[in-house]
Amino acid sequence: MSGRVGDLSPKQAETLAKFRENVQDVLPALPNPDDYFLLRWLRARNFDLQKSEALLRKYMEFRKTMDIDHILDWQPPEVIQKYMPGGLCGYDRDGCPVWYDIIGPLDPKGLLFSVTKQDLLKTKMRDCERILHECDLQTERLGKKIETIVMIFDCEGLGLKHFWKPLVEVYQEFFGLLEENYPETLKFMLIVKATKLFPVGYNLMKPFLSEDTRRKIIVLGNNWKEGLLKLISPEELPAQFGGTLTDPDGNPKCLTKINYGGEIPKSMYVRDQVKTQYEHSVQINRGSSHQVEYEILFPGCVLRWQFSSDGADIGFGVFLKTKMGERQRAGEMTDVLPSQRYNAHMVPEDGNLTCSEAGVYVLRFDNTYSFVHAKKVSFTVEVLLPDEGMQKYDKELTPV
């Protein structure tokens, strides 16, 4: 049995009744204490009564902390309203709302230099409440319960800038909050125009997604427009995505409903860096260098680094070793990212590199040009692996 209203086994029905009894003290404070709502929490924990109750009570604390009862009255900062991509637009063939996330135009540094992480998370929670409100309106319009949504992630333009660690951490926290506080609301998450970096991005988010959510993620291949039309009628799908829906002025992107973001003007910045905790620190003597090696076992991995120096600039470059088992000088290795000097004492430096081949990559901090000063360098380096199951993303969409 699916565990949904009208499709409960006798044991599930008994568990639901017991669950309602156990949480009767919080029922008046719930947004909608009907069986549909309570069953979401039970399904999220496989009808484990104790775990479901703990999850629901934690959700009630979340509502208080985030002031969810009034979040729709809250207005996000101007920067977010203008430049945070995404929006509600249309419905699938069953009447479920469709939310679009437009990844490419997202300006990671611009956002986090202009607003706080809490502003971003609060905006995302506000979006969730907007979507649930739309589900309630659809329930009234159609005369049947609408409790799930379709999400479309447009990954065109997904690039290394989107793997900036502070932004990744915001999205990881967001997906964690979604799983804990909005369980069983996702019908499908459809990925379109996935780039070669998508498997890396998916692997970063996967630990924060439940098994149930992962099963609902479908990556559409080259025929993604046809795939979307299997779920969404042409008149409900923006022309930009293969349908016939446009703005009143004929714009195929439906800009009145979907924000496409863009680069944020530096005049809107309120800070020029995000505080970073580094994993390593090293003192590099004058006239010397420090090398850090990372073995990359297969192409497509991403090297991601952040570093800062104390008091003066530092050279930095990335190389590929030509001989294994011994230290090589820079001139003996293959240049991958040519060494140059960075003012990392003024602004922390960060970067990414997609490894096009397997081998041992060397990140080299260069102080050979300094004949007077030693340099202290603090750094964090990570190897981001692509998800093996997502490396071949040519699934055909089969509506369930």
UniProtKB/Swiss-Prot annotation:
<keyword id="KW-0813">Transport</keyword>
<dbReference type="InterPro" id="IPR009038">
    <property type="entry name" value="GOLD_dom"/>
</dbReference>
<dbReference type="InterPro" id="IPR036865">
    <property type="entry name" value="CRAL-TRIO_dom_sf"/>
</dbReference>
<dbReference type="InterPro" id="IPR051064">
    <property type="entry name" value="SEC14/CRAL-TRIO_domain"/>
</dbReference>
<feature type="domain" description="CRAL-TRIO">
    <location>
        <begin position="76"/>
        <end position="249"/>
    </location>
</feature>
<comment type="function">
    <text>Probable hydrophobic ligand-binding protein; may play a role in the transport of hydrophobic ligands like tocopherol, squalene and phospholipids.</text>
</comment>
<dbReference type="Pfam" id="PF00650">
    <property type="entry name" value="CRAL_TRIO"/>
</dbReference>
<dbReference type="InterPro" id="IPR036273">
    <property type="entry name" value="CRAL/TRIO_N_dom_sf"/>
</dbReference>
<dbReference type="GO" id="GO:0005737">
    <property type="term" value="C:cytoplasm"/>
</dbReference>
<dbReference type="GO" id="GO:0070062">
    <property type="term" value="C:extracellular exosome"/>
</dbReference>
<dbReference type="InterPro" id="IPR011074">
    <property type="entry name" value="CRAL/TRIO_N_dom"/>
</dbReference>
<feature type="domain" description="GOLD">
    <location>
        <begin position="275"/>
        <end position="383"/>
    </location>
</feature>
<dbReference type="InterPro" id="IPR036598">
    <property type="entry name" value="GOLD_dom_sf"/>
</dbReference>
<protein>
    <recommendedName>
        <fullName>SEC14-like protein 3</fullName>
    </recommendedName>
</protein>
<dbReference type="GO" id="GO:0008289">
    <property type="term" value="F:lipid binding"/>
</dbReference>
<keyword id="KW-0446">Lipid-binding</keyword>
<dbReference type="InterPro" id="IPR001251">
    <property type="entry name" value="CRAL-TRIO_dom"/>
</dbReference>
